[in-house]
């Protein structure tokens, strides 16, 4: 199916921000993709919410601190110009206050992004989840809108364009037993590559996450061990997508966006997932590698 891609005019200049009320779950998105040709646009971030990474402090190791433990400076909701109220700061951590309502809820919930696009980088943070908790860390994310059957703009979910580092209570969440070869457990490339070794700590304890992206090579680390590696924009990457829920047959739009992950410039946002459960993140820092 052919898709039409075009840049969206700056939302700030137009005084328009795409509403998250149009965000769809995977099933409805797939149904629309199979029925209609879809025009897709990369929703340009609001200029008022952009963050110049040069304004942020750099530590002795060369990392940019993108969360200062006190404020949401540089952060906003995915597809929004503010931080949704279910994301709070607690004891020096970013916390999502879950409601058990499932992923990317409208209104006061939704995913959180840092409003600066990174290209080649190393990302480090710590995370913990509540019992049975589920979340994720996204990278190279775009803000993508499509047209529904009536021609209205709808905001697509963040995971339609971004690889996901899974954040999960492996012992108590059913997703840990789904997928293939444990590829939905913590630190896995969600639904594609399992984390090996699987060394996650249980719910309520802090885990260390590390993601390196450099010229297409991606490495996931968990608790000071590298657990997987893959290569974007290669046949291997396309084959991984085709074997996943994001295949060309199952979800054409996701396949097209992820196969060209990061868009034309191979860069994108870092994000944290609202999956309806309590989750905490802290000590978030990024080293630019180019």
UniProtKB/Swiss-Prot annotation:
<dbReference type="Pfam" id="PF06439">
    <property type="entry name" value="3keto-disac_hyd"/>
</dbReference>
<dbReference type="InterPro" id="IPR010496">
    <property type="entry name" value="3-keto-disaccharide_hydrolase"/>
</dbReference>
<keyword id="KW-0472">Membrane</keyword>
<keyword id="KW-0564">Palmitate</keyword>
<keyword id="KW-0326">Glycosidase</keyword>
<keyword id="KW-0449">Lipoprotein</keyword>
<feature type="lipid moiety-binding region" description="S-diacylglycerol cysteine">
    <location>
        <position position="20"/>
    </location>
</feature>
<dbReference type="GO" id="GO:0005886">
    <property type="term" value="C:plasma membrane"/>
</dbReference>
<keyword id="KW-0119">Carbohydrate metabolism</keyword>
<keyword id="KW-0378">Hydrolase</keyword>
<keyword id="KW-0732">Signal</keyword>
<keyword id="KW-1003">Cell membrane</keyword>
<dbReference type="GO" id="GO:0016798">
    <property type="term" value="F:hydrolase activity, acting on glycosyl bonds"/>
</dbReference>
<feature type="lipid moiety-binding region" description="N-palmitoyl cysteine">
    <location>
        <position position="20"/>
    </location>
</feature>
<feature type="signal peptide">
    <location>
        <begin position="1"/>
        <end position="19"/>
    </location>
</feature>
<comment type="function">
    <text>3-keto-disaccharide hydrolase that preferentially hydrolyzes 3-keto-trehalose (3-dehydro-alpha,alpha-trehalose). Important for disaccharide utilization in the human gut. Also shows hydrolysis activity with the glucosinolates glucoraphanin or glucobrassicin, but with much lower efficiency.</text>
</comment>
<protein>
    <recommendedName>
        <fullName>3-keto-disaccharide hydrolase</fullName>
        <ecNumber>3.2.1.218</ecNumber>
    </recommendedName>
</protein>
């Amino acid at each position: 199916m052919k898709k039409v891609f075009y840049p969206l005019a700056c939302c700030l200049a137009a005084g328009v921000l795409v509403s998250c009320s149009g965000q769809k779950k995977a099933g409805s998105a797939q149904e629309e993709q199979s029925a209609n040709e879809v025009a897709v646009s990369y929703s340009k971030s609001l200029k008022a919410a952009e963050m110049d990474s040069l304004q942020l402090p750099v530590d002795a190791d060369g990392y940019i601190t993108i969360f200062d433990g006190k404020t949401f400076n540089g952060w906003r909701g995915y597809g929004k110009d503010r931080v949704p109220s279910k994301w709070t700061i607690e004891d020096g951590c970013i916390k999502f206050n879950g409601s058990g309502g499932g992923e990317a809820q409208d209104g006061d919930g939704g995913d959180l992004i840092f409003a600066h696009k990174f290209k080649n980088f190393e990302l480090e943070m710590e995370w913990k989840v509540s019992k049975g908790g589920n979340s994720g860390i996204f990278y190279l994310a775009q803000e993508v809108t499509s047209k529904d059957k009536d021609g209205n703009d709808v905001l697509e979910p963040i995971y339609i364009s971004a690889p996901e580092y899974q954040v999960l209570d492996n012992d108590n969440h059913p997703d840990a037993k789904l997928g293939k070869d444990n590829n939905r457990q913590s630190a896995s490339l969600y639904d594609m590559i399992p984390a090996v070794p699987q060394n996650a700590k249980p719910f309520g304890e802090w885990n260390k996450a590390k993601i390196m992206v450099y010229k297409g090579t991606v490495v996931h680390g968990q608790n000071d061990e590298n657990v997987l590696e893959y290569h974007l924009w290669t046949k291997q990457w396309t084959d991984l997508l085709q074997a996943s829920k994001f295949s060309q047959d199952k979800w054409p739009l996701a396949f097209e966006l992820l196969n060209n992950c990061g868009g034309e410039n191979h860069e994108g946002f870092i994000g944290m997932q609202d999956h309806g459960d309590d989750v905490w993140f802290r000590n978030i820092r990024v080293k630019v590698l180019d």
